[in-house]
């Protein structure tokens, strides 16, 4: 696809996605019954001089069981400000870059709740190909939508914990975690400060010649970050992206950022998708949380 065709698809695609979000209230898809019992379990598994880690499970929408870890710092006054930390596609709540972030955040005084995305980590049920265009495309889409529900139920869990500050919840999502996080933070106003890393919008650009069909736009409508990103305002949004990202193209990140309302900021690193400078990325996220979680 040459650049002229790509720009044409982008221009028409933006109009199409905007039109769909106006006509169809896609955010209503993520409504659910808050009063359904969480049936949560919380078990202490690590206790050190600096922090505690709890193994957590809870009941989500569609009767799914979510597996998570809650880290709480010691020697800090409760209730703790809390960060929901979400991994990317194919990974789990204990993958190295999430472990790094967990340690970085609790050392800066935050509690951290990290969960396995739908059909990831301890929650794997099927191992089909994750592909928006393949024969398992609806199964793939359901992973995103279910994770959004799971994240909303994570906030329900936080609200039940006396040691966690339900009025100071941040979100830090990476790659697929950032894409699902854009939807989650758009539909759930209880998240005070979102940070989206390696996320982008206009997902129909992945569909080539089929990018502009009504079937494609209908299929993507409930997982298209462009349909939700405006709802984050007036909460402060930080995006962090790679200038050489080969998976979430920089153009997709720029489109998502442009669609977002102020207050917002975006930080770029000269990096590909899998070689972002982790410490700098988490440092910038922590600075954002320090400024706005008050």
Regions found by a protein language model. Name each.
Residues 249-257:
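Short alpha-helix in the alpha/beta-hydrolase fold that links the catalytic acid
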Residues 34-77:
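N-terminal cap/lid segment of alpha/beta-hydrolase-fold proteins
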Residues 277-288:
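Post-His helix in hydrolase/transferase enzymes
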Residues 90-149, 206-209:
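Cap/lid segment of the alpha/beta-hydrolase catalytic domain
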Residues 269-276:
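Histidine-bearing beta->alpha loop at or near hydrolase active sites
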Residues 232, 238-241, 245:
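Short beta-strand/loop motif that positions the catalytic acidic residue
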Residues 149-214:
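Primarily recognizes the serine-hydrolase "nucleophile elbow" in alpha/beta-hydrolase
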């Amino acid at each position: 696809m040459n650049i002229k065709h790509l720009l044409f698809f982008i221009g028409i695609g933006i109009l199409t996605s905007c039109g769909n979000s106006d006509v169809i209230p896609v955010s209503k898809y993520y409504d659910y019954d808050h009063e359904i019992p969480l049936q949560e379990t919380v078990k202490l598994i690590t206790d050190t001089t600096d922090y505690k880690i709890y193994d957590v499970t809870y009941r989500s929408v569609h009767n799914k069981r979510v597996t998570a870890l809650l880290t709480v710092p010691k020697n800090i006054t409760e209730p703790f400000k809390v960060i929901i930390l979400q991994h990317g596609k194919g990974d789990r709540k204990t993958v190295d870059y999430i472990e790094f972030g967990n340690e970085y955040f609790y050392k800066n005084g935050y509690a951290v709740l990290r969960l396995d995305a739908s059909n990831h980590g301890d929650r794997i049920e099927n191992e089909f190909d994750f592909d928006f265009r393949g024969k398992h495309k609806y199964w793939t889409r359901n992973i995103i939508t279910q994770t959004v529900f799971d994240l909303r139920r994570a906030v329900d869990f936080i609200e039940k914990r006396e040691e966690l500050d339900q009025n100071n919840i941040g979100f830090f999502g990476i790659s697929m975690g950032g894409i699902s996080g854009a939807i989650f933070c758009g539909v759930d106003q209880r998240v005070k400060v979102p940070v989206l890393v390696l996320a982008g919008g206009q997902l129909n650009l992945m569909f080539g010649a089929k990018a502009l069909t009504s079937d494609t736009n209908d299929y993507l409508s409930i997982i298209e970050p462009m349909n939700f990103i405006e709802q984050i305002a007036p909460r402060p949004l930080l995006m962090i992206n790679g200038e050489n990202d080969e998976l979430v193209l920089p153009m997709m990140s720029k489109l998502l950022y442009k669609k977002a309302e102020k207050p917002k900021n975006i930080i770029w690193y000269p990096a590909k998708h899998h070689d972002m400078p982790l410490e700098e990325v988490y440092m910038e996220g922590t600075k954002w949380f320090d400024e706005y979680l008050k």
